[in-house]
Every structure is written in structure tokens, then in C-alpha cells.
Amino acid sequence: LHEPPVDVRTGHAETLFESLEPGAGRRLRAYLDSASRIYGLAKEHFLYTDFRRPAALAHPDVLRALPALGPQLLGGLRSHVAARFQDPRLRQILGYPAVFLGTSPDRAPAMYHLMSHLDLADGVQYPLGGFAALVDAMAEVVREAGVEIRTGVEATAVEVVDRPAPAGRLGRLAARLPRPGAARGDEGRRRRPGRVTGVAWRSDDGAAGRLDADVVVAAADLHHVQTRLLPPGRRVAESTWDRRDPGPSGVLVCVGVRGSLPQLAHHTLLFTADWEDNFGRIERGEDLAADTSIYVSRTSATDPGVAPEGDENLFIL
């Protein structure tokens, strides 16, 4: 936390890296070229598949990339970065994106160096008005398409029955989606395939009801869906969840500040000097040290509409 700050800007990272470590600019160029290739491969063949069909992984592009992709799946991000850069600050810049994946650089596969393509090559985008503006824009688009959005309503149950999916286009869509019955239940045995018939709900004013549905897309926390919303005979046991590693949670602080903070950029990453101890405490579930890595977003540096004139809006992770 006591090193002089470095200013990382999209399109200028090679110059920065070279100034901190001779030869690092050239190595960063190769690093980002690899990150861009892996990102393109992931977006084209991995991001939009549910991996239910092996053929998705047998595409010629994927097979050609296996010699490079294999070691990146087996090796860790930390060692991948350390083999190319010596300066601790450069290692932290390239390793920290693992945090946004809910893990640490030594546990994340090296394949995730593709995150640096987004940070340092593509660049970070910010919607004026914050992400609330993005939500509003999406709501407008789906309403124009005939979608009804209900707020102040809690989904209390997903109803599932043991019978075949409907015929036709909706049935084919439902067959492609992961089924609640495909996971192991409380009894530890596989359940019969089923299909959803609806969703039960309860509103803030105490009213309750249900909606018929052929397909349910649940964007809630997966643990909540699998242990609370599904019918008892189709839930995933808590003992199963106890064996899973969901990744660390985060402490988020939203702060409105009177006065200006020009010393903060829109994005500021403050790294602790004892990088390994910081991640180790998180992984072991221990209390954090007094000096710990934090991320500060000063959105008012870019967007004048998020705070009164002369004041600041901060998001601290």
C-alpha cells in the first residue's frame, strides 16, 4: 500500500510495463495477444453453451487450440503471470482479475488471463447513469417486446411435475435447458425427469398467486433455487452444498461524500504488500489484516449525475 501509484490506461499498458520492468512491454504484448485469442475462443464456443453436448467442445477451432489451451486449464494464473513478469506490481495488476471470478490468482486456471484482454485491450465501459440506466434500458426493450415486469413480488416456489415436456417449439427449448431432475436430491439418487408447470409468488402487500409456465429461468442465487424454490423431492441436499466451494463473498460499501476526492480515479485498486497473506486469510475464513486489498470506484469522476455538484459517489469493495 506504500508503493508510488501507477496509472493503468487502456492502450498504454505496454509503455507502463516497460517503464517498471525492462522488456515487460514486449512480454505484455505477447501476453495480451494470447489473452485475446483465448477470449475469442471462449466467447465463440464456451460462453453460450450449457456443455450438455460433447460436440460443443469438438469444434475444429477448439481442437486446434488444445495444445495451448490444455496447459492453461491445468496451470494456475499466478504461476502463468510469474513466469513472464518479475515486478510485484505487474504481477498484481495481471493477477487481481481473479478476484472478480470469486477466487485467487493461485487457484484460478491460467486460462483466465483472458480477463486482461477486457481490462487492458478492450477497455472498461461505463454507462452514464450507472448500471441503473442499463437496467432501465433493458426493461424498456423487453416491455416493447411484450414482456410484463412485476416488481415487489417474491417467487416462493417453482412447481415441477413428472410428465413429458410439451410438444412443439417450447418443448424443444425446454428439453435443451438443464432440468431440476438432472441433479442429485436429498436422497442421493437421481430423480425422474420432470418439467415445470408454474411459479408461485407472494407480493409485498401479502397477496399470493401463481403463474403458468412451460420454462422457468431462475436468475436468483443458485443455492436458494436448489434448496428453497424447488419441490422437496427435487431439491439439492444441503450436504451436497457443504462440499462445494462457492467462492468468497464480498463486503460492499456505498458512500456519498461531501466534498471532492480528486486523488481517486474512476477505478482505484489498493493492493496490500503481503499479497499471499491477504488471499490466504480469505480462503481460510480468517479475519482480514489491517492492511487488505480494496477496490474503490469513484463513479462521480466520470458521471456528474450520480452525486451533487462538488460531492462524490464511491463504491468500495
PLM regions and their residue ranges:
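Rossmann-like flavin
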Residues: 2-107
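Helix-loop-beta segment of a Rossmann-like dinucleotide-binding subdomain
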Residues: 55-68, 105-139, 144
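A conserved beta-strand/loop element that lines the FAD pocket in flavoprotein oxidoreductases
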Residues: 141-156
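Short glycine/proline-enriched loop/turn "hinge" motifs that connect secondary-structure elements
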Residues: 105-107, 304-311
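Generic, well-ordered alpha-helical scaffold segments in large soluble proteins
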Residues: 80-84, 96, 137, 141-145, ...
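Generic recognition of stable, solvent-exposed alpha-helical segments in well-folded globular domains
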Residues: 23, 30, 76, 130-137, ...
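Mid-domain catalytic core of redox enzymes
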Residues: 156-178, 188-308
